[in-house]
Amino acid sequence: MNLNATFFAQMVVFFILWWVVAKFIWPPLVKALDERAKKIADGLAAAEKGKAELELANKRVDQAMAEARTEGAQRVADAEKRAQLTADEIKQNAQAEAARIIAQAKAEAEQQVTRAREALRDQVAVLAVKGAEQILKREVNAQVHTDLLNQLKAEL
């Protein structure tokens, strides 16, 4: 191997170039690469965190939907129960009103029957007196007439 001044000069230039690169170019380059690696790592961590948050949010949404369905079903069941109770109450009120109307109609019919019997007794008494009067062909005085009517009413 031939070692001459050119080789030493090239070595000096190489070491000067190496020193300049190591001193001025390499640190910013390493810093830029480190920053880039950090940004990539932060981005991946943020993506993982976002994915976990999305999964958690989906679970919360599913839970909220299940609760809403349960609450909706409960409200429907409560409404149906209230409607059934209201229908039963209306039915009971209608039955009570019907029973009251029937009792009132029976009482009224009984009163009409009683009044009709009284009227019939009065008419029978008058007819009996008229019949007796025609048979006897005479007029009965007022006191005897009243006594006869009362006696006929009592007998009928």
Curated annotation (Swiss-Prot):
<protein>
    <recommendedName>
        <fullName>ATP synthase subunit b</fullName>
    </recommendedName>
</protein>
<keyword id="KW-0472">Membrane</keyword>
<keyword id="KW-1003">Cell membrane</keyword>
<dbReference type="GO" id="GO:0005886">
    <property type="term" value="C:plasma membrane"/>
</dbReference>
<dbReference type="GO" id="GO:0046961">
    <property type="term" value="F:proton-transporting ATPase activity, rotational mechanism"/>
</dbReference>
<comment type="function">
    <text>Component of the F(0) channel, it forms part of the peripheral stalk, linking F(1) to F(0).</text>
</comment>
<dbReference type="InterPro" id="IPR002146">
    <property type="entry name" value="ATP_synth_b/b'su_bac/chlpt"/>
</dbReference>
<dbReference type="InterPro" id="IPR028987">
    <property type="entry name" value="ATP_synth_B-like_membr_sf"/>
</dbReference>
<keyword id="KW-0813">Transport</keyword>
<keyword id="KW-0997">Cell inner membrane</keyword>
<keyword id="KW-0812">Transmembrane</keyword>
<dbReference type="GO" id="GO:0045259">
    <property type="term" value="C:proton-transporting ATP synthase complex"/>
</dbReference>
<comment type="subunit">
    <text>F-type ATPases have 2 components, F(1) - the catalytic core - and F(0) - the membrane proton channel. F(1) has five subunits: alpha(3), beta(3), gamma(1), delta(1), epsilon(1). F(0) has three main subunits: a(1), b(2) and c(10-14). The alpha and beta chains form an alternating ring which encloses part of the gamma chain. F(1) is attached to F(0) by a central stalk formed by the gamma and epsilon chains, while a peripheral stalk is formed by the delta and b chains.</text>
</comment>
<keyword id="KW-0066">ATP synthesis</keyword>
<comment type="similarity">
    <text>Belongs to the ATPase B chain family.</text>
</comment>
<keyword id="KW-0138">CF(0)</keyword>
<comment type="function">
    <text>F(1)F(0) ATP synthase produces ATP from ADP in the presence of a proton or sodium gradient. F-type ATPases consist of two structural domains, F(1) containing the extramembraneous catalytic core and F(0) containing the membrane proton channel, linked together by a central stalk and a peripheral stalk. During catalysis, ATP synthesis in the catalytic domain of F(1) is coupled via a rotary mechanism of the central stalk subunits to proton translocation.</text>
</comment>
<dbReference type="InterPro" id="IPR050059">
    <property type="entry name" value="ATP_synthase_B_chain"/>
</dbReference>
<dbReference type="Pfam" id="PF00430">
    <property type="entry name" value="ATP-synt_B"/>
</dbReference>
<keyword id="KW-0406">Ion transport</keyword>
<feature type="transmembrane region" description="Helical">
    <location>
        <begin position="7"/>
        <end position="27"/>
    </location>
</feature>
<dbReference type="InterPro" id="IPR005864">
    <property type="entry name" value="ATP_synth_F0_bsu_bac"/>
</dbReference>
<keyword id="KW-1133">Transmembrane helix</keyword>
<keyword id="KW-0375">Hydrogen ion transport</keyword>
<dbReference type="GO" id="GO:0046933">
    <property type="term" value="F:proton-transporting ATP synthase activity, rotational mechanism"/>
</dbReference>
